[in-house]
Swiss-Prot record:
Organism: Sus scrofa
GO annotation terms (biological process): cellular response to type I interferon; oxidative demethylation; steroid metabolic process
Protein name listed in UniProt: Cytochrome P450 3A29
Function field: Cytochromes P450 are a group of heme-thiolate monooxygenases. In liver microsomes, this enzyme is involved in an NADPH-dependent electron transport pathway. It oxidizes a variety of structurally unrelated compounds, including steroids, fatty acids, and xenobiotics.
Keywords: Endoplasmic reticulum, Heme, Iron, Membrane, Metal-binding, Microsome, Monooxygenase, Oxidoreductase
Length: 503
């Protein structure tokens, strides 16, 4: 039997040509860094280097840093990524050349209405939305929002007390995830939910749908392999964000907005109201104000950016305190000195707590929620003697920077003293980037820090964390999406002095 099909010569030529073209399509960009003399791992056709992410982006970047030094080139599919760790280059990318060259993040496929979200908007649209939203996150506005967040701090204590009374180990993500969800949905959408005790609430269910993400999701991989599919998906109204959830939040915001416009008693100082106010400001050019679609997109991106980051950071913080009882005790002493007899925390006093700030900063050094920062290069440019072609994505590997032994002695150790007043001024600001830096840094940085600090103070006023047999020591991480524990952080919760305040 003939094993080779009896195709005509023309068919064989067509088949061979197709295979060659397919190969060239999947590899044509892969010679870029070799031409530029920039080292890096060898890419595979279509995949590039993404298979190296299977153990986590942090593991991959650390390996590249050890092997290639301060700069290397990799490929996500066919997309070239230039990783830089030199502080001067980082400053050029994130600050100096932000408006002219490195304005935008990498475009990730069909976004639908979410292209209007601050984190995803580009160029002039991003500038306009950022300008409109910036007043929402001033210290004055956050101070006005503080009572809302404080209410959920009390609810957090109440929920923890119930768990502590059971005498069983507690999964930190469940508790802090509920707190984070409650704060975000309350401030961004004006709804009050106790998500730990109401997991079926549609706000909770739709928020969690938004947060399901995997780098190896087939849909996402198809966009990496074949980016030309993006406009086709846009036309078909297929996006990276679940349509049902976006529709739910659109209807909810419309209903909430109408309610607040007709009944002034329902108004309060929160992110939603501040965005509505910006829409209706007489001083605002109506062509520059937020549209209803943009208002919804900001609310959704606040959930996307705020829920996972805060809950993961607090879980990791609790782990470090449980495994460093001396740090936990010292922090509790500062809390007691600042708020005697378990007095309710205040915005101004929280901001002045030096050791609390040190503990939070060191946690975000060890566990930066975003393992990388990315900026797309809009035009050919040379930065500090390195030519960066248009279309290249420049990556700042934050996880690697935060654990570089040349910058941080014994970087794997948890040492809040690194951020004491004595040492803080010696830290190069372009080597510590938990919230990014420059014009496109995290707009919600102050909000996130206030949120975390309030939760930590309220919990430590009433409880102490201790490891238990279910606690994974040492902790292992996964960074295929955001930095989080490979296994949930499970700890024992011990009430202090047998009493719980504010619960």
């Amino acid at each position: 039997m003939d094993l080779i099909p009896g195709f005509s010569t023309e068919t064989w030529v067509l088949l061979a040509t197709s295979l060659v073209l397919l190969y060239l399509y999947g590899t044509y960009s892969h010679g870029l860094f070799k031409k530029l003399g920039i080292p890096g791992p060898r890419p595979l056709p279509y995949f590039g280097n993404i298979l190296g992410y299977r153990k986590g982006v942090d593991h991959f970047d650390k390996k590249c840093f050890q092997q290639y030094g301060k700069m290397w080139g990799v490929y996500d599919g066919r997309q070239p990524l230039l990783a830089v760790t030199d502080p001067n280059m980082i400053k050029s990318v994130l600050v100096k050349e932000c408006y002219s060259v490195f304005t935008n993040r990498r475009s990730f496929g069909p976004l639908g209405a979410m292209r209007n979200a601050l984190s995803l908007a580009e160029d002039e649209e991003w500038k306009r939305i950022r300008t409109l939203l910036s007043p929402t996150f001033t210290s004055g506005k956050l101070k006005e929002m503080f009572p809302i967040i404080s209410h959920y701090g009390d609810l957090l204590v109440s929920n923890l007390r119930k768990e502590a009374e059971k005498g069983k180990p507690v999964t930190m993500k469940d508790i802090f995830g509920a707190y984070s969800m409650d704060v975000i949905t309350s401030t961004a959408f004006g709804v009050n939910i106790d998500s730990l005790n109401n997991p079926q609430d549609p706000f909770v269910e739709n928020s969690k749908k938004l947060l399901k993400f995997s780098f190896f999701d087939p849909f996402l991989l198809s966009l990496i392999f074949f980016p030309f599919l993006t406009p086709i998906f846009e036309v078909l109204n297929i996006t990276l964000f679940p349509k049902s959830s976006v529709n739910f939040f659109t209807k909810s915001v419309k209903r909430m907005k109408e309610s607040r416009l007709t009944d002034q008693q329902k108004r309060r100082v929160d992110l939603l109201q501040l965005m509505i106010n910006s829409q209706n400001s007489k001083e605002m050019d109506p062509h520059k104000s937020l549209s209803n679609e943009e208002l919804v997109a900001q609310g959704i991106i606040f959930i996307f950016a705020g829920y996972e980051t805060t809950s993961s950071a607090l879980s990791l913080l609790a782990y470090e305190l449980a495994t460093h009882p001396d740090v936990q005790q010292k922090l509790q002493e500062e809390i007691e000195a600042t708020f005697p007899n378990k007095a309710p925390p205040t915005y101004d006093a929280l901001a002045q707590m030096e050791y609390l700030d040190m503990v939070v900063n060191e946690t975000l050094r060890l566990y930066p929620i975003a393992a990388r920062l990315e900026r797309a290069c809009k035009k050919d440019v040379e930065i500090h003697g390195v030519f960066v072609p248009k279309g290249t994505v420049v990556v700042v590997p934050v996880f690697v920077l935060h654990r570089d032994p040349d910058l941080w002695p014994e970087p794997e150790e948890f040492r809040p003293e690194r951020f004491s007043k004595k040492h803080k001024d010696t830290i190069n600001p372009y080597t510590y980037l938990p919230f990014g830096t420059g014009p496109r840094n995290c707009i919600g940085m102050r909000f996130a820090l206030m949120n975390m600090k309030l939760a930590l103070v309220r919990v430590l006023q009433n409880f102490s964390f201790k490891p238990c047999k279910e606690t994974q020591i040492p902790l292992k991480l996964t960074t295929q999406g955001l930095t989080q524990p490979e296994k949930p952080v499970v700890l024992k919760i011990l009430p202090r002095d047998g009493t719980v305040s504010g619960a």
